[in-house]
């Protein structure tokens, strides 16, 4: 009786594990497939090209002097609006504890 339950339980586990592995193998087969269709290949190549350009320039890619001027102008506006604070740091907040008055409870 116990042996039958053990065999039944092991067959259930075996089927669940096989389904799990079959599903994961199907996903990894697609992930490791290096043969891409031409559109995917162009897309991936453009992303890699953009990444390398961004790393070499250290900032926005394919921008002209007008972009830099606009960026400077907008940062200047923000500094004027928010008290000339450094826009690259998180502001520090200073909260003061409220002062409460002690009120005597009248005798009942």
UniProtKB/Swiss-Prot annotation:
The record's GO molecular-function terms, alphabetically, read:
proton transmembrane transporter activity
Any one GO cellular component localisation term in the record: proton-transporting ATP synthase complex
Feature: transit peptide? 1-32
Paired cysteines (S-S):
none
Q: Does the keyword Amino-acid biosynthesis apply?
A: no
Q: Where in the cell is it found?
A: Mitochondrion; Mitochondrion inner membrane
Provide this UniProt record's keywords sorted from A to Z: Acetylation, CF(0), Hydrogen ion transport, Ion transport, Membrane, Mitochondrion, Mitochondrion inner membrane, Transit peptide, Transport
N6-succinyllysine modification, residue list: 84, 94, 99
* A Pfam family matched in the record: ATP-synt_F6
Q: What Gene3D superfamilies does this protein map onto?
A: Mitochondrial ATP synthase-coupling factor 6
Residues bearing the modification N6-acetyllysine: 41, 46, 79, 84, 94, 99, 105
> What does the entry give for GO biological process?
proton motive force-driven ATP synthesis
Give the protein's function: Subunit F6, of the mitochondrial membrane ATP synthase complex (F(1)F(0) ATP synthase or Complex V) that produces ATP from ADP in the presence of a proton gradient across the membrane which is generated by electron transport complexes of the respiratory chain. ATP synthase complex consist of a soluble F(1) head domain - the catalytic core - and a membrane F(1) domain - the membrane proton channel. These two domains are linked by a central stalk rotating inside the F(1) region and a stationary peripheral stalk.
Question: Subunit structure, per the record?
Answer: Component of the ATP synthase complex composed at least of ATP5F1A/subunit alpha, ATP5F1B/subunit beta, ATP5MC1/subunit c (homooctomer), MT-ATP6/subunit a, MT-ATP8/subunit 8, ATP5ME/subunit e, ATP5MF/subunit f, ATP5MG/subunit g, ATP5MK/subunit k, ATP5MJ/subunit j, ATP5F1C/subunit gamma, ATP5F1D/subunit delta, ATP5F1E/subunit epsilon, ATP5PF/subunit F6, ATP5PB/subunit b, ATP5PD/subunit d, ATP5PO/subunit OSCP.
Q: Which family does it belong to?
A: Belongs to the eukaryotic ATPase subunit F6 family.
Which protein is depicted?
ATP synthase peripheral stalk subunit F6, mitochondrial
């Amino acid at each position: 009786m116990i042996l039958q339950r053990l065999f039944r339980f092991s067959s259930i586990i075996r089927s669940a594990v096989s389904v799990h592995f079959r599903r994961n193998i199907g996903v990894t087969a697609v992930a490791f497939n290096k043969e891409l269709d031409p559109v995917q290949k162009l897309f991936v190549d453009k992303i890699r090209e953009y990444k390398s350009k961004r790393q070499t320039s250290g900032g926005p890619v394919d921008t002209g002097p007008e972009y830099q001027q606009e960026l400077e102008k907008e940062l200047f506006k923000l500094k004027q609006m928010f008290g000339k604070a450094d826009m690259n740091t998180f502001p520090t907040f200073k909260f003061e504890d409220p002062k409460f008055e002690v009120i005597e409870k009248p005798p009942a």
